[in-house]
Regions:
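Alpha-to-beta junction loops
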Residues: 43-46, 121, 126-135, 151
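Periplasmic solute-binding protein
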Residues: 1-24, 33, 44, 50-77, ...
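Glycine-centered hinge/linker elements that transmit conformational signals in sensory
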Residues: 36-38, 79-113
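Short helix-initiation/N-cap motifs at beta->coil->alpha
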Residues: 27-33, 108-126
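Short, solvent-exposed loop/beta-turn-alpha elements that line the ligand-binding surface or hinge
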Residues: 24, 67-91, 97, 145-148, ...
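Extracytoplasmic/periplasmic substrate-recognition and gating elements
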Residues: 145-216
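Short amphipathic alpha-helical coupling segments at ligand-binding clamshell hinges
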Residues: 87-94, 174, 183-195, 203, ...
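C-terminal capping/gating helix-and-loop segments adjacent to ligand/active sites or protein-protein/ligand interfaces
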Residues: 236-299
Length: 306
């Protein structure tokens, strides 16, 4: 059962991007890359990412955005045509273009593979070196110590492939599990029920993060998947990110890759996400990446834990 959820998207500086700001907010990938070309002339990169693993939520969203929920559900269950389809190729080509040196901040890959370097990539958005990055609202508390008081975060839904599409927002969820052989299953069920109570909703909303060095506390609300919970948030970027999921013409996406049996020598994270670093460095082409994903899906389908 889900006990918390976080909408994800592209985070940015609301004082730099948006209505009436230096850069307009793009809604399609075509507009997004055009913005990148404009920002590049100003010495600003379009994009950065904390680590390649942060492409998980981006890829889930892109699959739904490209082909709708039926295509998405087939893809996360390793449908063999996922990456040879028009929609799958569109996702691969977009990721390859986004991760290229033309649009991704020059220090991204080096930082992403250094201890603690993910924060340097996140800082690049704060410092105006890059416009957007994939993330969730936890980034606000994570970067609180190095964020200027007058900086304003915002999150946008990832871009659409065409203007007439509905907008998809991927929602990251965390789950509570009861082992099937648990000694106190009935008690565990009561605890899960308690997790949806008003008391827990309020406790989660009041959560704070503490800076290890300064001991300074920063609000870090955790949102329960209870109707109306996000409405209790204070006005600001966190509440705005939840409002996105219920906006007209928007559909929330959840779920993860289907579970498989252990596959000897196969690293899902490195194959699907780690390879994106290689798209940036030129060690891997979009066509090679597509082939790699196609072969991975064949292997994963064969080992699907049915």
């Amino acid at each position: 059962a889900p006990w918390t959820y976080v909408p994800t998207g592209f985070w940015y500086n609301a004082d730099l991007v948006g209505e009436g700001k230096k850069y307009s907010l793009p809604t399609t990938w075509e507009e997004f890359f055009a913005l990148g070309d404009k920002a590049k002339k100003d010495g600003i990169a379009l994009f950065t990412y904390p680590t390649a693993g942060y492409f998980d939520t981006s890829m889930y969203q892109m699959l739904a955005q490209a082909g709708g929920m039926e295509f998405y559900n087939k893809a996360v269950n390793y449908d063999p045509s996922t990456w040879t389809s028009k929609e799958g190729k569109e996702v691969v080509d977009t990721i390859a273009k986004l991760a290229s040196k033309d649009y991704t901040w020059s220090d991204t890959v080096a930082n992403a593979n250094a201890d603690g370097g993910f924060k340097k990539n996140q800082q690049a958005v704060i410092d105006g070196k890059a416009l957007f990055m994939p993330n969730g609202n936890w980034v606000i508390g994570e970067m609180a110590a190095s964020t200027p008081k007058d900086f304003h975060w915002a999150m946008m839904a990832q871009q659409k492939f065409s203007a007439d599409q509905k907008t998809y927002v991927y929602t990251y969820t965390e789950q509570i599990w009861i082992p099937k052989d648990a000694a106190n299953i009935d008690l565990a069920k009561q605890f899960i029920k308690f997790m949806y109570s008003d008391k827990v909703v309020e406790l989660m909303l009041a959560n704070k993060s503490v800076n290890k060095e300064t001991k300074e506390e920063t609000p870090a609300p955790i949102i329960s998947p209870v109707k109306g919970a996000s409405d209790k948030l204070e006005a600001g970027p966190v509440k705005d990110s939840y409002t996105l999921t219920s906006a007209s013409g928007t559909e929330a996406v959840a779920g993860v890759w289907a579970t498989t049996k252990p596959i000897n020598g196969f690293d899902m994270k490195a194959t699907v996400y780690g390879a994106i670093d290689s798209l940036n460095t030129g060690e891997l082409t979009a066509a090679q990446y597509q082939k790699q994903l196609e072969e991975a899906w064949t292997k994963l389908l064969e080992n699907l834990d049915r």
